[in-house]
Amino acid sequence: MMGEVLVIVVTWNAMTWLERCLGSVRGSSVKADIMVVDNCSTDGTQEYVRRAFPDAVFVQNDSNAGFGAANNIGIKYALSHGYRYVYLLNQDAWVDKDCIGSMIASLGDGYGLLSPMQTDARGNLDRNFERKCGKFLARHNDSPVVPVPFVMAAHWLVPTQTFRIVGGFSPVFTQYGEDDNFIDRLHYHGLKCGVVRTATAVHDRLDRPSSKERRMRLKCVSVIVKLSNPSACFTGQCLILPFRLLGMSVKNRSLVPLRFFRELSGMIPVLKRTREESKASGAFIF
C-alpha cells in the first residue's frame, strides 16, 4: 500500500552514504516510500539499491542529468501517483526517526516548504545552514517554526500542492543554484519556507576538498540565480551583472568570474525566456 510521503534521493556514486541515507527513511516513524533517481553512478550504487532496498522505485538515467532534472522525475512521479508530500533528501544526508513526522505536523500558515535543523555528522549545526538560517533562528527563538528566506535543499519537505503552484526545478541550473531559484519562485507565488526546530537531520559534507576554480564557478552561479528571479527586474540585473562579476574577480583575485561573463553573455536570451516560463503554475513539470 502506497504511503502519503515519497522520499526522493538523487544519486551519483553514493555508496559512501546510502546505507545510512536510505536506512534512515526505512526507520522513520512515518511510513515513507523511497524513489532513487540515479545519474549514471559507477561505484555500484544501482546494484546496492536494487539488492538492499527492493521496495524502492528505482530510475536509471542515461546520463548525469543533474540534481534538478533528476528530482523533477521524482516530483512528476509523486504528482501522478497521488502522494501528499515529497521529501527531497540528499544522498549524503539522513533523517532522525521523528524528523518527517514533526515536519508534517508543523505544516500550515502559508508554508510551502519546510526544513529540519540540519547538522553535520559530528552533531554540530551544518556550517552553511547556520550561515543562512542562524540569525533567523536566534531572532525567533520562541517559535517552533521559523520563517527563513532560504534553506538548502539537502532536506526539504514539500507538499505536492506546492509543486502544482511553483513547479519543478528550472532546467537552467544543472549543479547548484536550483534550490535558490526554487525558493525565489516560492516567494513569487506568495508562499513561505521555514525551519522546524523539533525536527533534526544530518548533512554529512565535511572535509571534502575543492579547488579554488571550482569554488569560484559556484560563486558565479549566484549571478544566474539573480537573473532568474521572477520578482527582480531582469534589465536591472543585466546592467549590474558586469560590475558584480568584476567585483567578485577583484575580491577573490581570480579570472574565473571574467571568463564566466563571456559564457553568460550568450545565455541571456535563454535566461530571459526561462525566467518568464518559471512564473507559470507548475512550471517545468506540466
Where are the model-predicted features located?
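Non-catalytic, C-terminal membrane-associated alpha-helical segments of glycosyltransferases
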Residues: 215-222, 230-286
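Short, flexible, basic/aromatic active-site loop/helix in glycosyltransferases
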Residues: 130-149
